[in-house]
Amino acid sequence: MIIATGLAPILSMVKLPTRELVAVLVATSFAAGLNLYATVATLGLLARAGVLPLPPTLTVLTHWSVIAICSAIFAIEFFADKIPAFDLIWNALHTFIRVPVAALIAYRATAALSPWEQLAATLAGGVIALAAHGGKTAVRAAVTPSPEPISNMVLSLGEDGLAVFLTWFATQHPYSAAAIVGILLIIIAFLVRWVVRSLRALFRGAEEELGVASPPRT
């Protein structure tokens, strides 16, 4: 706690330019939507290493207690997220954690901006995290029925790695990281659309197999 408090003056002296801050928030919000605990722990470690100048309002992320708790939960999630079916329950519950926390981080990170800019950043952070989380959940829902567990594990490992990589990469190349997120959001939009269509076709096929007539369309 004393060490973290001592970091506050140092972090307050070094600030990211507004545009770079927004770019970092875009990348970290997406990362939080994939894996919140890995993202928060990585942010805290990068700040303590002097790689990322966090705003004074986010110095709480540099507390060793916060880093330790997030790292411990990440370790639990690392295994829980790779169990077919259970991962869907885990991700469903985290809809109410990842998105609000990502929005809160964006809100506190932009405390020095105008109220309207802060509100816009908060909403953007929440929406980006929701898009990443929604895309992850949709793909998992499509993969879970598969009899082999390897695809689920590979997806989970990829998501964990991407969350950590994006968080770090945003500190080195914020604009490139934000551009990557933009591309990923477009891919997610197409993936979600494909998953929804596939699930509809699956349900229609199941209805036909069971001999349940679908209601006529008008």
Name each model-derived stretch.
Residues 27, 104-110, 136-143, 156, ...:
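Generic transmembrane alpha-helix signature in multi-pass membrane proteins
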Residues 100-109, 118-138, 161:
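Mid-bilayer segments of alpha-helical transmembrane spans in multi-pass integral membrane proteins
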Residues 2-20, 47-64, 105-121, 169-179:
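Helix-coil boundary and interhelical linker segments in multi-pass alpha-helical membrane proteins
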Residues 75-88, 135-144:
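C-terminal ends of transmembrane helices
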Residues 95-107, 151-165, 211-217:
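Small-residue-rich segments of transmembrane alpha-helices in multi-pass membrane proteins
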Residues 21-46:
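The first (N-terminal) embedded transmembrane alpha-helix
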Residues 58-65, 110-119, 137-148, 197-209:
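A cytosolic-side transmembrane-helix exit/cap motif
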Residues 63, 87-100, 120-122, 147, ...:
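Cytoplasmic-side transmembrane-helix entry/capping segments in multi-pass membrane proteins
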